Amino acid sequence: MSYLLDPSRKTVTIPKLQAMREAGEKIAMLTAYDSSFSALLDLCGVEVILVGDSLGNVMQGQQTTLPVTLEHMVYHTECVSRGNQTALLVSDLPFGTYPTPEKAFESAAALMRAGAQMVKLEGGDWLAPTVKFLVERSIPVCAHIGLTPQSVHALGGFKVQGKTDESAAQLKRDALALQQAGAQLIVMEAVPAKLAAEVTAQLSIPTIGIGAGVDCSGQVLVLQDMINIYPGRKAKFVRNFMEGQPSIEAAIRAYVAAVKDGSFPAVEHTFSA
């Protein structure tokens, strides 16, 4: 992908994302699993590229993300890294690869060697010691709270989280504990918009929403969902950005623009308590 290199384009860093949050500029994030789409997302101004374990669904045809292995994540991270020039590259720690802080470090180090600049892991305040352990060893962390797909069986399915007073209070505790442990980014999935706004307001780090309303610091979607090439029923928070667009590039640019101007997510993509 050397033909895409442009020395005038500035690299997106964690401090850059923090500055965007403080300035009120929305952050656009999308998934990618190969070098071609990675290069296209980067070229279209996507600030954060996520190598998600969602590859289990959209690349491997799995029903859940649970079968995805660390080896799968390393391979796809390497591919995405080769296509990316400026976006911040985040990779998921897959199911079963962070049972202890020490094991989490081994897994995260493998992803960092493959080209990740930050790792994402799913869980609440119980993960704070692991996050602290990673951050102290120079591994930036994005935490993922709310609906955590790796916990699909424990949660009883893909359900909106934080709908009761008790679960909403726990989500707030989770977010604060993970920030205090050193997380520099938090993804909130399938959370009522009002609750996500409250969590965002109580934190000093950026939040990225997926089905969490417009008041998060930014938004993320699975690429195959937003360009409408993944068959089957779509989640409520998905919008088909290919509609009315002449190309995938145009759809990605439309997504970035909609995130930036706050028109996505709209009310129809949002959950209420």
Curated annotation (Swiss-Prot):
Know the name of this protein? 3-methyl-2-oxobutanoate hydroxymethyltransferase
Q: Which reaction does it catalyse?
A: 3-methyl-2-oxobutanoate + (6R)-5,10-methylene-5,6,7,8-tetrahydrofolate + H2O = 2-dehydropantoate + (6S)-5,6,7,8-tetrahydrofolate
Native organism is: Cupriavidus metallidurans (strain ATCC 43123 / DSM 2839 / NBRC 102507 / CH34)
Q: Which gene encodes it?
A: panB
Keyword Metal-binding assigned to the entry: answer is yes
Where does it reside? Cytoplasm
| A GO cellular component entry from the record | cytoplasm
Keyword annotations from UniProtKB, A to Z: Cytoplasm, Magnesium, Metal-binding, Pantothenate biosynthesis, Transferase
Q: Record-annotated residues binding 3-methyl-2-oxobutanoate?
A: 53-54, 92, 120
Q: Needs which cofactor?
A: Mg(2+)
PANTHER family given in the database record: 3-METHYL-2-OXOBUTANOATE HYDROXYMETHYLTRANSFERASE
Query: Oligomeric state and partners?
Result: Homodecamer; pentamer of dimers.
The kind of enzyme this is, by top-level EC class, is transferase
The pathway noted for it is: Cofactor biosynthesis; (R)-pantothenate biosynthesis; (R)-pantoate from 3-methyl-2-oxobutanoate: step 1/2
Q: Which residues form the active site?
A: 189
> What EC number(s) does its UniProt record assign?
2.1.2.11
SUPFAM superfamilies recorded for this chain?
Phosphoenolpyruvate/pyruvate domain
Task: Write down the Gene3D superfamilies for this protein, in alphabetical order.
Answer: Phosphoenolpyruvate-binding domains (3.20.20.60)
**Into which family does the record put it?**
Belongs to the PanB family.
Indicate whether Transferase appears among the record's keywords: yes
Q: Its biological function?
A: Catalyzes the reversible reaction in which hydroxymethyl group from 5,10-methylenetetrahydrofolate is transferred onto alpha-ketoisovalerate to form ketopantoate.
Per the record, the major location class is: cytoplasm
Cofactor info, note text: Binds 1 Mg(2+) ion per subunit.
Name any one GO molecular function. Answer: 3-methyl-2-oxobutanoate hydroxymethyltransferase activity
GO biological process terms, alphabetically, are:
pantothenate biosynthetic process
Write down a Pfam family by its short name: Pantoate_transf
Q: Which residues bind Mg(2+)?
A: 53, 92, 122
